[in-house]
UniProtKB/Swiss-Prot annotation:
Domain Radical SAM core residue range list: 70-305
UniProt-recorded name of the protein: Biotin synthase
Domain of life per record: Bacteria
Keyword Metal-binding: yes
Gene: bioB
Reactions listed under catalytic activity: (4R,5S)-dethiobiotin + (sulfur carrier)-SH + 2 reduced [2Fe-2S]-[ferredoxin] + 2 S-adenosyl-L-methionine = (sulfur carrier)-H + biotin + 2 5'-deoxyadenosine + 2 L-methionine + 2 oxidized [2Fe-2S]-[ferredoxin]
Enzyme class: transferase
Length: 362
């Protein structure tokens, strides 16, 4: 087998020639990834240097080849519920739930009852979701008492969801100890969302009340307990392409199973409230590069896809995405699940439960 050159094509005089040469390079590079090679940081930076809508679509086409070969055509569908909202102790610059910069329009309430959560779990299952994530504000159970009542209540609710529905419960409760990770595992949690949000070097520009390493430690605790890590980040917070690539490389190093990619939808009153929304083609480029770096991972359209991508949402599913968060988000509205199902059908894709790394067989 002849390996693709690790260098991008040199410019030629004709735009058509340049595009054809770029396409050939991307095809060879994507085949290398399909064959089991790993993209280097230098190669990822070369992909990030691709400019122009037509050329970015060529990059997306190559990333889509990787997705088809390594993951198949099933799009993983999940839904979330904000089980406790507002008055958060952390100062994440993107979040309207923070007590440091509260949004008057962001809801504040205590832990929802088991009955309320079960009702929404059933609704999520009816909408086609295969997983249902219980999300809570706060730094996490790690900083609560060992017999924290709310943590115990969430564990009990997880057990009830398993007993009474066909949907798989996930959690996103913040930082956990190894012991708490084991409790979650024993309750039936098989996947836990805990995002890194940004690269190690950019993180302290977004949050100062805890560290990037704190988040990494929790991901490692979850993995050690046998829980799949649903760990990604947010694009469009002012980070560089190097930051985006370093985030993807960190996720590869941690061997996470699922990677939610949120596209910043700036919230009024937050430190990032005036941040310009990401250009949709930059979002597509980032999605494609993540797929090159993470060929077998579940890469998920998460918050902000409607606000940032608009009528171009379908292109993300042609750029490496193989999962979607359906329904509403934590503090913003999503589009109707029926629209998502129609979108998938129009692309010849099937909603369901996507394979984790190492599971897919063509």
């Amino acid at each position: 087998m002849v390996l693709a050159s690790s260098r991008p094509p040199s410019p030629t005089n004709s735009p058509a020639d340049r595009q054809g040469t770029l396409q050939a390079w991307l095809t060879g590079l994507s085949q290398r990834i399909i064959d089991g090679d790993r993209l280097t940081r230098e190669e990822a930076l070369q992909l990030a240097a691709i400019e122009g809508e037509e050329n970015i679509l060529l990059l997306c086409e190559a990333a889509n080849r990787i997705r088809e070969a390594c993951c198949g055509n099933v799009v993983d569908l999940c839904s979330i519920i904000n089980v406790k909202s507002g008055n958060c102790s952390e100062n994440c610059g993107f979040c309207s739930q923070s007590s440091h910069h509260p949004d008057p329009n962001s809801p504040i309430y205590g832990l929802k009852t088991e009955a309320e959560i079960l009702e929404q779990a059933r609704a999520a299952a009816a909408a086609g979701a295969k997983r249902f994530c219980l999300v809570s504000q706060g730094r996490g159970p790690k900083y609560h008492s060992p017999k924290d009542r709310e943590f115990e209540q969430i564990l009990a609710t997880v057990r009830q969801i398993i007993q009474e529905t066909n949907i798989k419960p996930c959690c996103a409760l913040g930082e956990v100890t190894p012991e708490q990770a084991q409790q979650l595992k024993e309750a039936g949690v098989t996947r836990y969302n805990h995002n890194l949000e940004a690269s190690a070097t950019y993180y302290d520009k977004i949050v100062s009340t805890h560290t990037w390493q704190d988040r990494v430690d929790t991901v490692k605790n979850l993995k050690a307990a046998g829980i799949q890590a649903c760990t990604g980040g947010i694009l469009g917070m002012g980070e560089t392409w190097e930051d985006r690539i370093d985030l993807a490389l960190a996720l590869r190093e941690l061997e996470v199973e699922s990677v939610p990619l949120n596209l910043l939808n700036p919230r009024p009153g937050t430190p990032l409230g005036e941040q310009q929304k990401l250009n949709p083609y930059d979002a597509l480029k980032a999605i494609a590069i993540f797929r090159f770096i993470l060929p077998q991972q579940i890469i998920r359209y998460a918050g902000g896809r409607e606000a940032v991508m608009g009528e171009l949402q379908d292109l993300g599913l042609k750029a490496g995405i193989n999962a979607m968060l359906v329904g509403h988000y934590l503090t913003t509205l999503g589009q109707p699940p029926e629209r998502d199902q129609k979108l998938l059908a129009s692309l010849g894709l099937e909603g369901g439960e996507a394979p984790i790394p190492g599971e897919y067989q063509s």
